Amino acid sequence: MKVRASVKKMCDDCKVVKRKGIVRVICKVKKHKQRQG
């Protein structure tokens, strides 16, 4: 899980989702998991 100021899709499988006001990136590639913070 990377915590970043700006979350971006890193590949075509990445999805940007908003959960409880937190922007997250979910992906089958574990290295691509991110959240905004």
Curated annotation (Swiss-Prot):
Protein name: Large ribosomal subunit protein bL36
The family this protein is said to belong to: Belongs to the bacterial ribosomal protein bL36 family.
Single GO MF descriptor: structural constituent of ribosome
Alphabetical UniProt keywords: Ribonucleoprotein, Ribosomal protein
GO BP, sorted A to Z: translation
Lineage top rank: taxon: Bacteria
Coiled coil (UniProt feature): none
Lineage: Bacteria, Pseudomonadati, Campylobacterota, Epsilonproteobacteria, Campylobacterales
Gene expressing this chain: rpmJ
